[in-house]
Regions:
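Short aromatic/hydrophobic "clamp" motif used to bind/position activated sugar donors
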Residues: 84
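A conserved acidic beta->alpha catalytic loop
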Residues: 36-45, 64-65, 88
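Short loop->beta transition adjacent to catalytic acidic/histidine clusters or analogous donor-positioning motifs
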Residues: 1-2, 23-34, 42, 55-58
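Acidic helix N-cap motif at the loop->helix transition within catalytic regions
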Residues: 16, 41-49, 96
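Conserved donor NDP-sugar-binding/catalytic core segment of glycosyltransferases
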Residues: 96-138
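Glycine-rich, basic loop-to-helix element that forms the pyrophosphate-binding segment
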Residues: 62-79
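Short, well-formed alpha-helical segments that are part of the catalytic scaffolds
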Residues: 11-24
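Conserved nucleotide-sugar donor-binding catalytic segment
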Residues: 140-226
Length: 287
């Protein structure tokens, strides 16, 4: 029924909590496609141990470290299920996350995906502390995700006004998700979500049922050194790192089309590229 793709690289600190969170779901008819991107820490042995214990886990260790996008594409390509979700190796889910979102999708064929409200955390998650699950009401309704409903143009306009893109880890209908091939560039999840929205709406279940870790290399503070980030983390060439938002601009233009882009997004992307160039220059001259 559902494939859960977990791309992981050097995730020894979090992968056990992630897998426990998924294996403790009230819905159990799923497979886990666990792809280790040639980790150099204990990730491989941890993943193999879990795969040996649970036949629902398909564990693959890549021979060499590929790009983040290639690992995300890989786990999606392995899926033969009707529904698919990516699971970040450092995130946590409420036990009813899958059940409630699948129930919605089963009864609403015009929706291409469903997720829940999201709460961000930056510390180490204590598995024995279940207090976060006892009160799953958000601090602010739709703080990080918001239902995306309407025409494609309306959804695009709202999404860029909302300016938050925590939809990547929703449960999607696999056939629509596979219509877009992920390319490796900063914020590649934006055109991915836009492309999926061509085929229907995206639901957000009430209450926080996903807890997303924000203390990694792609945290907001890390983007203050934009030139360094794009070179060292994303693998951009020196020239590409000078213009880090150009790939995103190009891919969004291709997905939404010239009419919607010129009408709703042109000014925004001009400003975003301008701000990016300022950050790049500040990073370069602060060295």
């Amino acid at each position: 029924k559902l494939s859960i793709g977990i791309p992981v690289y050097n995730g020894e600190k979090f992968i056990q909590k992630c897998l426990n969170s998924i294996l403790n779901q009230t819905f159990t008819n799923f497979e886990i496609i666990l792809s280790d991107n040639a980790s150099t820490d204990l990730t491989t042995s941890i993943c193999q141990e879990y795969a040996n214990k649970d036949e629902r886990i398909l564990f693959i260790k890549q021979k060499s470290t590929g790009t983040r996008a290639s690992n995300y594409n890989f786990v999606l390509e392995q899926s033969k299920s009707e529904y698919f979700m990516w699971a970040s190796a450092d995130d946590i889910w409420h036990p009813e996350f899958i059940e409630k979102n699948l129930m919605f999708l089963e009864t609403h064929p015009d929706f291409v995906g469903s997720t829940s409200e999201v709460e961000l955390f930056t510390g180490i998650w204590n598995e024995n502390d279940t207090s976060k699950f006892k009160n799953i009401q958000p601090k602010k309704k739709y703080e990080w995700v918001h239902p995306l409903i309407g025409t494609f143009e309306e959804k695009v306009k709202f999404l860029f006004n909302f300016r938050k893109f925590e939809y990547m880890y929703a449960i999607f209908r696999t056939n629509h998700l596979k219509k877009y091939i992920i390319k490796e560039f900063m914020t590649w999840e934006v055109p991915l979500i836009l492309n999926v929205l061509k085929y229907g709406n995206l639901n957000v279940e009430h209450g926080v049922m996903m807890f997303k870790y924000m203390g990694g290399k792609t945290s907001p503070d890390h983007y203050k050194k934009l030139f360094t980030t794009t070179k060292n983390y994303w693998g951009y060439s020196t020239l590409a790192s000078l213009f880090p938002f150009v790939p995103l601009t190009f891919h969004v233009f291709n997905v939404v089309g010239p009419k919607i882009f010129l009408k709703h997004l042109l000014k925004r992307f001009i400003m975003d590229n301008y701000r990016a160039e300022r950050l790049v220059l500040l990073d370069i001259f602060s060295k």
